[in-house]
């Protein structure tokens, strides 16, 4: 979990709901019972009874529901009169179809909603924890609206639905072809092709080895020729008139329903990528929905025919977005609504009030990636269901009535991994067909265990039927093969072993998968100082990743710390202090801090310590004492730097206990040496020293560059490398 920041108000009281009419469920031998799991526990256990997701719900989930409780009361009093008028009109013209009754929204109602939306629950535990999981069936009015939609524009869209449509080719492929591909994936038989797309970008593509040739797709510069729903064509062309940069290489694989891992995400290109993903997600929801509606109409028309229509999953949600903050969710939703252009957005004001916030003006000097991630509402505890009808997008829909789910890993896990086994539920993930993870590197800094937990529960057989019509469920769902058809898209600023594990373990798409990574020049060549800085890298031996922390600690205490202590205790000049030790892992930080506090070796060394869990008073004290020389050494975690991006003064020498994951941090931390212009030459001579092992290959490549990393890992003539 991220350190606490300024949060938007949490919690609301739940309104009463009308009774929900459900269809009888089906039973089948194909649905496996999943035994109740034990709660996994961990540092987020405190949220089991404290969801804080501000989710209260109105009555039945039809697209004519109103945000105002006053409308409901008014409707009750007016209902007998309205029903009488409707009866008279129907009698007068029995051939005319009954028109759908909609509620009008008045200014007074909006003011009432505004007052209700700012009410904060005194105790978040009073919220109904499983309210967003309650199942509701489409109302009769929605069904009528759907039939009208099929008659109105079904023919126009049908031209786009052919065998060349990636949607049809991917999800409706022949069973014998699918079986061969699934077997190849299960046997881990992949055919791979690699290509240098440009001087700064590499592509690796893999597909199940079934004997077919494999090549790379051509770049996509315009979406004009894509098989999009007619409703999306015009707004998509307006927002994405031209595709540029790396997105040209990514887009063909995204719209072809292949798994995508992109490791070169930048703030400058995030808007374009977000729009591309929004187009793809909405297009998928609309095509899935229209296919079901057209088949519904066909069943109603051909009631005596023996139709075998396989067009559904077990549950309604089809798209899952995993995002780091509420503000990131707002940006995605804005892209979605601007593309879908609904006539009505139910609960939109409440969504903006609880999810959006203004940027902190004091952060104008912060780096762009920091402002993008933490700007606005940076709360990492949320989940949201979006429901699409012909003219409406409904916010805060229950998950089983939603088409899309947007959530943070923490927000989603709190309802999946509750202490009460009866309340645990992950069936709403059973039919997810598109998973989109944006800013995956930010999720690493929160708690990657939540992400891994969610991935392990994707596309499992549901424990309950949830009103499913199993005669319409696709065969590969029933055969428990949905994970081989699911598309996963993950965007990150850089690749880590955890992210690579997702690529190899969870990206099992029968259509193939790609990994797109940059060619790094190296952060050491981009230091912000006006003078050259001595940058030294020391390699130590490590037998395995599990033994790496012990080997690193031993090398640090015997080789690095001994010389550091000598300089501090015997020095009479300016070199005796100002030593910043940057530690990537919090566990390593605790180990080093305890060693400084208890070891005889560091008995005469004064030090301060700052981590992501330090309170503000301790942080200010440690920074002040380090700047004025009272502390010779300052221990500093990479994760703290990620969340705060402070400028540390008084630094004369930097020791990297391990190279940082984020290459931007290298330049920022080296820049601390130049905070005092009068002593910049001395600080440049003190320079930077970093420890690394062969298990740090991915991190090291980003720091020293793609061309240098191989020699530094394999060099047998020495284990010290210096760059100036």
UniProtKB/Swiss-Prot annotation:
Keyword Ribonucleoprotein carried by entry: yes
Region listing for Disordered, in residue ranges: 1-167
CC annotations in GO: nucleolus; small-subunit processome
InterPro entries: P-loop_NTPase, UTP25, UTP25_C, UTP25_NTPase-like
Keyword terms, alphabetized: Nucleus, Ribonucleoprotein, Ribosome biogenesis, rRNA processing
A GO BP annotation: maturation of SSU-rRNA from tricistronic rRNA transcript (SSU-rRNA, 5.8S rRNA, LSU-rRNA)
Keyword Ribonucleoprotein: yes
Basic residues composition-biased segments: 7-24
Acidic residues bias (residue ranges): 34-74, 123-166
Domain of life: Eukaryota
GO MF: rRNA binding; U3 snoRNA binding
One matching Pfam family: UTP25_NTPase-like
Main location group: nucleus
Subcellular location: Nucleus, Nucleolus
Function: DEAD-box RNA helicase-like protein required for pre-18S rRNA processing, specifically at sites A0, A1, and A2.
Quaternary data: Component of the ribosomal small subunit (SSU) processome composed of at least 40 protein subunits and snoRNA U3.
Family membership: Belongs to the UTP25 family.
Protein name as it appears in the record: U3 small nucleolar RNA-associated protein 25
